[in-house]
Structures are given as structure tokens and as C-alpha cells.
Amino acid sequence: EEAWERYGSHPAFAGWYLTQEVGRLQWNIIEVFHELGKFCKELSGGLPTAISPYIEGIQLYDPFRTGVNAGKSVTLPDFEREWNEIMAGITGCVDSISFQDGGCDYSELEDFLSVACYAGKKHGILINTNVEAFDRDMPIRFLPIKWDKMLLKLRAAEKAGVAGATMFEFSHFMSPNSSYFQAHGLNRCYQHYLAGGFEK
């Protein structure tokens, strides 16, 4: 309510991001997304709502365990079943879902996003990818991702049929003003890609 009272009249206030990030059907998340999304829509006259869950795959970083692989990767059939159930329960309250792409292996990303897109069409929810611009394959947490890995993820998302892409996190990992030297090169490669380079 406070955010709406302060900023709701600004033209830049175009919708809501529900910040609860989950990867699976857990913690009464259907009720949380349903109630929060419904509240935000009613408060703002129907402005769109979005969530950005992660794919709980082999690359998922668990700060409470040693190593990157948390040892609890979701299978594709379980992902499909759980997200169908979640989407069925939040239809009309959540308009778009941007799946964080860093949790699963590159070879599995297209399959997970394809399943998500199919479920999204079934339930009337727009599916996007949330491209993580940092590298999970390095012993240091976290450095800007190599361009060829980002391109691989963008192409997998395109093949899966996502509606669009968002990114986490531009200012640290891809900005030409970032303190990470690697971010400057990543930004140049991405600009070249947008201009039609690298044979989209």
C-alpha cells in the first residue's frame, strides 16, 4: 500500500514484482502468490504482476551446503507437474513468470523452459527467461558470465518459445561502468548481438 501511495501516480509504475523466489511447490506458495497478486491488482486497478522463480537444477547454489550442486535437482516431470499446479492456482493473479536460468545445466535449459511455456499457454500466463549474467561454474561467487555461455542460454530460451527476457544483474555483471573488467567485454558482445551479430 505504501509503495502504491507514494509511486502509483508515476507513469513508470507499470506493474508489480512479487519478490518471493521459490523453485518448487512448497511453503504454501500458491496461496502466497494468489493473495499477494490479487491484492496488488485490486489496489492498482489491475496492473500486471510478475514473479521470478528459479529452476532447482544441478547448478543451484545453496549457501547452506558445500559446493554448487545442492543435491536436490528437480526432474523434468516433477517440474512440469508442480508448475502446472502452481500456475493453475495463480491464474488471474500473476500475469508473467520469468524463470531464472542459472539453476539448471545448459543442456537442460531448453527442456525446462519449453515445459514452462507449454504450461503458461495452458493457464494464460506469459513465460519469460531471467538470464543470469554471472557464472556459476567458477570457484569464486560470482563473476560475470562468459559471452558464449550467455549466448547459449539466450538461444535455448528462444528455441523454447519464451515471450521475452529479463536479466539479473546488469549493474554488477554487464554494465560498461561495472568494477568487473569482464563486464565491459560482455556488454560489448551483447550490443553486437543485438545489432544482428553472431548469427542469431
What are these regions (language model features)?
Residues E1-K200:
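Glycan-processing catalytic domains of CAZymes
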